[in-house]
Amino acid sequence: MTPPAEPPLGGYLVVDLSSGIAGGYCTKLLADGGAEVVKVEPPHGDPLRSWSASGAAIPPDGDGALFSFLACSKQSVLADPDRPGDLDFVRELLDAADAVVWSPGAGLAAHPALAPAEIYRTLPHLTVTSITPFGLEGPWRDRAATEFTLQAWSGGIIGLGRGSPNRPPVFVGGQVGEWVAGAYAAAATMTARFAGLGTGRGELIDLSILEAQILCLTYFPVTFFDTAGRPWRTTRALSVPGVATAKDGLVAVGCGTAQQWSDFCAMTGHPEWVEEASTLSITAQANLVAREIEAWMGSRTVAEIRALATAFRVPNALVGNGANLPFMDHFEARGSFVRNPRDGFTQPGHPYRLRPARLRPFRPAPRLGEHTEKYRALSRPPRPAIERPSTSDRLPFTGLRILDMTAFWAGPSCTHFLSMLGAEVIHLESTSRPDGTRLLAGLPVTEDRWWERSGIFSGLNTNKKSLTLDLRHGRGRELLRALIPTCDVLVENYTPRVLDQIGLDYEGVRTLRPDAIMLRMPGFGLDGPWRENAAFAYVIEDASGLTWLTGHPDRNPLEPYSIGDPNAGVHALNALLLALEHRRRTGEGVLVEAAMVDAALNVAAEQVIEYSAYGALLEAAGNRGPGAAPQNLYPTAGLDEFGRSDCWVAIAVATDEQWAALRGAIGDPEWAASPRLSTAAGRREQQTFIDEHLAAWCEPRTADQVVELLWAAGVPVGKVMQPHRQAELPQLRFRGFFEEVEHPVNGRVRHSTLPIRLSHGPDRFHVSPAPLLGEHNRELLTGLGLSDSQIAALAAEGVIGTAPYSSR
């Protein structure tokens, strides 16, 4: 088939009034999809033009490599906020545009006429996407924050109990919250476009980076707490094996399920390590024999360990970093890395692949103001004025039917976004293999209806329907083939061989519905040497470099144990929205390949870029980071809720002005008055000295006292929250981020929503609880023409059911 003339977003004009990674990545994804992105910059340019995470010198006539990556395929125009004529120019651009992406750090963001609400008030045709730390409204809207302090507030620094109980908690390195917020912003922008088709109406999208972090760095801790009556974990614990030292380097091996732990023990020749009657978690059991596991791993090469683990179906990976990633055999075979079209360094390719729809090939990033005269000379008619439409109950994806053949976190998080905004999502399971998150209830299987009591499953699957079909049974496969033509989209995250073996690859699906969109979410892609490798979040983190930047410098890196899954989900969502737009324009179906590892390589892009461009290998640095000095966690007075002296605050000084504010807030002590501390470079050289004094100042004060003093002065600070306490934050209460959902088994339970608030609603995201297993069998099978007697026969044969096979 001849490729389409243009990518899905061709003709879609986006004005970029943002700065930083989140806005830059949002508009990069839109540009990759074909949008015309015009970046409006002040005379000194976007700060990222002079940024290098390693501190590499950027020549005056050049740009930082990260900027060159994020700005691929964009246009740059200059506008000075102090010149009225330039503001008129920006207004003309906005008049002609379809969307604008805004963040508070941009050069023109402070001008009242260019505030998000004001832009939307005067130009209601526009989709206005605002990206801020806490949201546009609420008690914390103007509070100072950085990626690091937001991770403290989100609970992401604690995560699932990451790290050693004998060390401070440790944040996830690499600015991951900004990258994920950018991906959510791109998806929200395309969602508003989807909703506005035919009406001409715009949308004000209010995105909170804090809320994006909650969804991607923590595992529905509030919902789990409400259903299980306890936190997921009360102490930090190292993943064992996790990232281990082999005879010739680092290797990652993980056990995310009881079966994998059993297989790992068999692989090592120690089946006695499995204690089936034990009440301890897998992590706790593994930690009991950590020294023995360490010795076993250390006596073998990386290749030997990986070959054994793969044979035993135990998840495993090489440990990626900026130096080695482009040369791994799998990524070489798939062409996962390309050359930057302007500066020649190595960068990741697109985070997903579409066929026959296409993404825009990377074009050179613009020089500062390169396209100013072009856009000043253009005469684009402004959009015709529209009446602000009355509020409608119709949600963006009303009328869209999704067959959700995914499990665990990555796939369901993608389809959950759709179900919360109106799509009919049919979650397909079987009684022999229910969704794996149903097993994460934190309860013994002797408990009544244990499979309905998982807060994790509930957190990912509200508003969905449940259908059970045993695909090992011929009748189950027949019914699946009957269901597919009724669905617009099929989403699956099996290893590739599973659907291929039953004739339901994309070509097979097309024979059933020619315009179907098939979204495939394999861990490592549809081809390449690792095609069939088991993929869980932590393995994706290891293989992509996300793990490499997390942990203490004197220890092996620590797996974030979180972001690999939801990051894959939000990138798959972006790809699906592009596919829907392609189908709207052409009538064609689309195969979408959204490999989890490709999404991870993109949010970890800075490592490969820095190494390729500057020869700098970024590494884990504990709780320090390249964007602030000082930046660290400091112990505070008091006991935590578990009776331990384990209370911490996160402090990050990102500017010289914030350093002056910090000095004033702590009484301008003599030690802080040294001229060598007045610059970021000087403070970076003296971080240990500063840390010692800040720790002494924080130690006699409670975390709340430290936060009150420093925030009032404008210093980024955060209390390190236990994740299950997220709902106590005043800002989240103000924004209604958590909603109570009545569940037939679990009762009234708090659920997180989406990290966006939309001017056209909905006022409430959760309209029905997560489905019971097979709850909608009768409804959906009747819709396929089956009679009650036929449905009863299917239940008798075990093709369908409402309880796991092992519980019957």
Predicted regions and their residues:
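Flexible glycine/proline-enriched surface loops and loop-helix/loop-strand junctions
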Residues: 111, 167-177, 245-249, 357-360, ...
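Terminal low-complexity tails and localization/encapsulation signals of metabolic enzymes
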Residues: 1-13, 245, 321-404, 619, ...
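Oxidoreductase and adenylate-handling cofactor-binding alpha/beta cores
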Residues: 154, 182-203, 219-225, 265-272, ...
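Conserved Rossmann-fold dehydrogenase catalytic segment
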Residues: 136, 166-175, 197-213, 230-236, ...
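N-terminal helix-loop segment corresponding to the beta1-alpha1 unit
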Residues: 1-198, 225, 303, 341, ...
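Aromatic-enriched alpha-helical interface/lid elements that frame and gate functional surfaces
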Residues: 239-312, 316, 630-713, 717
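Short, well-structured beta-strand/strand-turn elements
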Residues: 36-37, 310-325, 425-428, 711-725, ...
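Glycine-rich beta-alpha junction loops
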Residues: 44, 133-135, 209-214, 248-250, ...
